[in-house]
Amino acid sequence: MATTEDDRLAGSGEGERLDFLRDRHVRFFQRCLQVLPERYSSLETSRLTIAFFALSGLDMLDSLDVVNKDDIIEWIYSLQVLPTEDRSNLSRCGFRGSSYLGIPFNPSKNPGAAHPYDSGHIAMTYTGLSCLIILGDDLGRVDKEACLAGLRALQLEDGSFCAVPEGSENDMRFVYCASCICYMLNNWSGMDMKKAISYIRRSMSYDNGLAQGAGLESHGGSTFCGIASLCLMGKLEEVFSEKELNRIKRWCIMRQQNGYHGRPNKPVDTCYSFWVGATLKLLKIFQYTNFEKNRNYILSTQDRLVGGFAKWPDSHPDALHAYFGICGLSLMEESGICKVHPALNVSTRTSERLRDLHQSWKTKDSKQCSDNVHIAT
């Protein structure tokens, strides 16, 4: 007779404790899309990011059938900051994080309404586009040129990016968001790639990890963002020499204790099983890490009652760590989890759908070009 998750939870041994409770995590991500605890209220302006963790988490668990895809797609499109009729707000276009400003619900591609405080946010544009692709949308209502114009307006002279047009912190996180946006839209005109590459290169620290910027401390998250960005650009081996890449590999592989930490002498944290693990995967040496210790650590942070993962054992689970815990397990090919694309941070199924979408755009553009030539002659 098949063993259910409830049966396994009834056990008291360590073997039961380290089971991956897939169905619990499906329900956890469902709740993240429906109702959130009061402590999440401060994240209202970043609601689209929470939706990404939940939707991509369900996709990784092959369980997107539990959500109403069409309704969520309409909601995401309603968060698109569209150009006005005179297109005077192009530098502010992209996706906002939620409807907190009270902008009228508009999931169409019609001209947007001007609002002095309305603008896209680079991380929300990244997660918004990701969610649409995860849900099977063809991005047909995305104003691609406006998104790219808004992205160009966020790049600074040193090659880094701000989050919003008014200015904000600028660091490697937003370079990664920009790289993902350009990759998903299959158009790198949204950034000055040479400047972005220079920023990544200058962020390499004395100990060979990558920092949030030049002269700062190496960090597992920023190392992922820099390496993944270069991989999406197809420039990794042009930017760093073999010797430098070997040094980066060494820095990353030294981050493992049982799970991974992001900086020397810092505690192990679930999310770094993806940040550092995916970097090692991109650098083609993840197979030399200790899978058993990593898996045991991730599962030690699993909430066996409500699902999800926390950053540490005996802590409350949250959407971010739940998602990256699953992605960390995916890198080790855990049963019941789809494969993750280590650079784009979505399932390989979604990345393949995106590749097919790019091909369809290319075919459409070629046909349109051919038709124009035919008309001209």
Swiss-Prot record:
Reaction(s) this enzyme catalyzes, per UniProt: geranylgeranyl diphosphate + L-cysteinyl-[protein] = S-geranylgeranyl-L-cysteinyl-[protein] + diphosphate
EC number: 2.5.1.59
Key words of the record: Magnesium, Metal-binding, Prenyltransferase, Repeat, Transferase, Zinc
SUPFAM superfamilies: Terpenoid cyclases/Protein prenyltransferases (SSF48239)
Cofactors: Zn(2+); Mg(2+)
Enzyme class of the recorded protein, top EC level: transferase
UniProt remark on cofactor binding: Binds 1 zinc ion per subunit.
Domain of life the protein comes from: Eukaryota
PFTB repeat residue numbers: 144-186, 193-234, 245-284, 291-333
Residues reported to bind Zn(2+): D269, C271, H321
Keyword Nucleotidyltransferase included in the entry's annotation: no
Gene Ontology, cellular component aspect: CAAX-protein geranylgeranyltransferase complex
Biological process annotations from GO: protein geranylgeranylation
The UniProt record lists the keyword Transferase: yes
One example GO MF annotation: zinc ion binding
Membership in a protein family: Belongs to the protein prenyltransferase subunit beta family.
Function: Catalyzes the transfer of a geranyl-geranyl moiety from geranyl-geranyl pyrophosphate to a cysteine at the fourth position from the C-terminus of proteins having the C-terminal sequence Cys-aliphatic-aliphatic-X. Known substrates include RAC1, RAC2, RAP1A and RAP1B.
Subunit (UniProt): Heterodimer of FNTA and PGGT1B. PGGT1B mediates interaction with substrate peptides.
Protein name per the record: Geranylgeranyl transferase type-1 subunit beta
Taxonomic source organism: Mus musculus (Mouse)
Lineage start: Eukaryota, Metazoa, Chordata, Craniata, Vertebrata
